[in-house]
A protein has these predicted regions:
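Phosphate-handling catalytic cores of nucleic-acid transaction enzymes
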Residues: 1-226
Length: 226
C-alpha cells in the first residue's frame, strides 16, 4: 500500500531565561499559555498576560513614580506561527475572571469610537488580530480619513494621560456634542501581526510623534513550519 505520511513533530521550546524572573499570577498565565499552545510562543504569551493583568489592575495601582498599568504590546510571529493562541488567551482570562466589561471589541472603527469605549469603561483591554493593518492605516496621514488617523492620536494621548485626566475636545454645539472627560484612562492593547506587515507599516513619523515609543514590541523567537 501507499506509505503513510507522518506529520512533522515540532518540539516545545525550552523555558526561556526571562521566564524565571517572573512571579505570581503573571508567571502562571505565561506558563499555562505556553504549555497548552499548539505552537508555543512564550514572548507573545508574556504580552498577552501583561496587557490582560494591566487592564484588570487599571486605575487601582500605581508605581513609586505614579506609573500606571496601561500597556500597548505588539506580538509578531509568522503566519501560522501560533500568534492567535496568546491573543485568545488574553481575552479568555478576562472572561473567566468574570470581568467581561473590561474586554473591548475585536476592532476599533475610529478615534471617536475609542473615546466612547473608554468613557464607558475607563480600564479596558483590546485584543486585535492583524493589528499591523490598523497601525498602517492609522499612521498614513496622506491617505487615511481623519477618523482613522484619530485612533493613533487618541492612543498616544490616552497613554500620557493615564495618571491624570483626559479632557477631550470642545465643539461649537456642546449640547449635541458634549466634551468627553475621562478620569485616569487605562487603555491596554494586545495585538498580533506578521513581521512583514508590521515593519512595513512603520515610518519615520511613528518615531517623531512618539507612538512607537509607547509600544512594547515582542517578536517571536520560535518559528514553526506550515
Amino acid at each position: 500500500g501507499e506509505p503513510s505520511i507522518v506529520p512533522a513533530i515540532v518540539s516545545s521550546p525550552s523555558e526561556p531565561n526571562w521566564l524565571r524572573g517572573l512571579g505570581g499570577p503573571l508567571r502562571g498565565f505565561v506558563e499555562y499559555v505556553t504549555a497548552t499552545a499548539p505552537s508555543p510562543q512564550p514572548l507573545l504569551a508574556l504580552g498577552a498576560g501583561l496587557t490582560a493583568f494591566g487592564a484588570i489592575a487599571g486605575r487601582r495601582y500605581a508605581g513609586p513614580t505614579d506609573l500606571r498599568t496601561n500597556l500597548y504590546c505588539i506580538g509578531i510571529a509568522d503566519s501560522g506561527g501560533g500568534k492567535d493562541y496568546p491573543l485568545k488567551s488574553a481575552a479568555s482570562l478576562i472572561v473567566e475572571a468574570g470581568m467581561h466589561h473590561v474586554l473591548g471589541g475585536a476592532k476599533i472603527a475610529s478615534g471617536p469610537a475609542l473615546i466612547t469605549s473608554l468613557k464607558k469603561q475607563p480600564n479596558i483591554l483590546y485584543t486585535i488580530d492583524e493589528i499591523g493593518f490598523l497601525l498602517s492605516a492609522a499612521a498614513n496621514r496622506l491617505r487615511s480619513p481623519k477618523y482613522i488617523l484619530e485612533i493613533m492620536d487618541n492612543m498616544t494621548e490616552f497613554y500620557s494621560m493615564s495618571d491624570s485626566k483626559y479632557l477631550g475636545t470642545d465643539y461649537a454645539d456642546q449640547e449635541e456634542r458634549p466634551r468627553e472627560v475621562i478620569e485616569q484612562p487605562c487603555l491596554c492593547m494586545f495585538g498580533v501581526t506578521t513581521p512583514n506587515v508590521f515593519w512595513s507599516s512603520l515610518s519615520s513619523g511613528n518615531v517623531g510623534d512618539g507612538s512607537l515609543a509607547r509600544m512594547i514590541i515582542l517578536e517571536s523567537e520560535n518559528n514553526y513550519p506550515d
